[in-house]
Curated annotation (Swiss-Prot):
The lineage of its organism: Bacteria, Pseudomonadati, Pseudomonadota, Gammaproteobacteria, Alteromonadales. Pathway: Bacterial outer membrane biogenesis; LPS lipid A biosynthesis. Belongs to the transferase hexapeptide repeat family. LpxD subfamily. Homotrimer. This is UDP-3-O-acylglucosamine N-acyltransferase. Its EC number is 2.3.1.191. Keywords: Acyltransferase, Lipid A biosynthesis, Lipid biosynthesis, Lipid metabolism, Repeat, Transferase. The keyword 4Fe-4S does not apply. GO terms for biological process: lipid A biosynthetic process.
Amino acid sequence: MKSVTLKELSLLLDGVVQGDETLVINSVATLEHATSGQISFLANSKYRAQLESTQASAVLLSAKDAQDYQGTALVVKDPYVGFARVAQLLDTTPKAAMGIHPSAQIDPSAQLGDGVAIGANAVIGANVILGENVQIGAGTVIGQDSIIGSNTRLWANVTLYHNVHLGQDCIIHSGAIIGSDGFGYANERGQWIKIPQTGGVRIGDRVEIGANSTIDRGALGHTEIHNGVIIDNQVQVAHNDIIGENTAIAGSTTIAGSVTIGKHCIIGGNCAIAGHLTIADGVHLSGATNVTGNMREPGLYSSATVAMDNNLWRKNTVRFRQLDELFQRVKAIEKNLNTPE
């Protein structure tokens, strides 16, 4: 079990200890469930009541919240960021693989850096390059001519098609498929003609891709996911999309082909983005937003209908269908009112 003193944490987080700085911390927990030896945090005032009753040995607090707290605290600028840093430090998540399993199938042309680990029944294709300390989980398949940067971790049953490049310090979760064909077809007299998808996928450093997400390869050029992007579970990224640095995309979102999303965007869950659009830096889409046009300015955008009583929803649905008729009636009334007698 890992452990660290509050004094050591204060140096890591540039914080100030309020209480016993020799106190030893071995894990993190919520205010409600923390016990001795654990550190918790208060980042939302609605949990203030739990602060008074917590059994945590120490709590990460802002300077304001620490003023009236009688227990041991580590005062930091942002308690939630502090919690994330401590959680990383004390993380006990097992590795995706240890050593190279004898059942792994590794092409002789593949290049493996120092410290590479490959799990059972994994397949490493021709001309693949794995950087130092890469972890390849059991059953994962890496297609030919792919490159994976150092310290990147692929969990079990990930599939990388050919010509996929991953940067350093990435995490790819189970079931993710990267580099499958984009949805490219031409229609000739009612029959679909497949367009070979000859591009690849280029993923930067510190990217995390959630379970069962799919990222299509480019039709001609590459699909690009830039540094620091985080993608939740069950997200679809289509061919030739470009996602800017440090953008976050929540689960069940679908992005059609040839979309360019800027830097530092937040895309809520279950959003749908039509193809060939541009979304500016700093755009925030709330959950279930349907994007059908370019977004040139940063800001918060929404389009989903919120939940309501079913009977009210039925009435409003009927009224929505009558909007055009109502508009024409109002327009006619206005015209008559403005007509001189």
